[in-house]
């Protein structure tokens, strides 16, 4: 009986350490942005992330909204911009804008991405210059959601994530 308990404890410890290895670890907090690193089966993943400063409407039930820029060197991916608004998206309904600049995102379930590398580069340039960003989307039921993001701290979080995965 004791051997069985020790074996089960050993298995639990191994799985616990495995889960902890995949948990993102903060590499810096910069005003409204934070950078993270995590280890995956395909290598290191680094990202800058922000939560919205304002979400509307309050009546729509949804999970957390987040805006990301991700680096996955093991998969040769850099500057990947993605958004989740905490709900499944109606197809082709996600836009992000700052001032007169507006970008349309491709969506799948509850995540949205820009369509090509050049758009991502241009969008990141906008994020570095902007003070705020507004993300609008529609739920699969047709309700419009709006999330406001502050860009304060973005450049430092972005640079930290990029450097961590270099």
Report the location of each language-model feature.
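N-terminal signal peptide c-region/cleavage motif recognized by signal peptidases
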Residues: 16-18
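Sec-dependent signal peptide recognition
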Residues: 2-10
């Amino acid at each position: 009986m004791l051997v069985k308990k020790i074996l089960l404890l050993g298995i639990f410890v191994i799985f616990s350490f495995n889960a902890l290895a995949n948990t993102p670890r903060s590499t810096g907090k910069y005003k409204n942005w934070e950078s993270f690193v995590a280890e995956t089966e395909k290598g290191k993943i680094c990202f800058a992330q922000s939560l919205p400063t304002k979400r509307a409407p309050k009546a729509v039930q949804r999970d957390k909204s987040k805006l990301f820029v991700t680096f996955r060197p093991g998969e040769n991916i850099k500057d990947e911009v993605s958004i989740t608004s905490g709900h499944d998206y109606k197809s082709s309904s996600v836009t992000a804008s700052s001032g007169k600049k507006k970008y349309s995102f491709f969506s799948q379930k509850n995540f949205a991405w820009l369509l090509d590398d050049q758009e991502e580069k241009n969008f990141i340039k906008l994020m570095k210059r902007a003070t705020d960003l507004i993300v609008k989307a529609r739920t699969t039921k047709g309700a419009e959601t709006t999330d406001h993001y502050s860009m304060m701290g973005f450049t430092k979080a972005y640079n930290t994530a990029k450097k961590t995965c270099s």
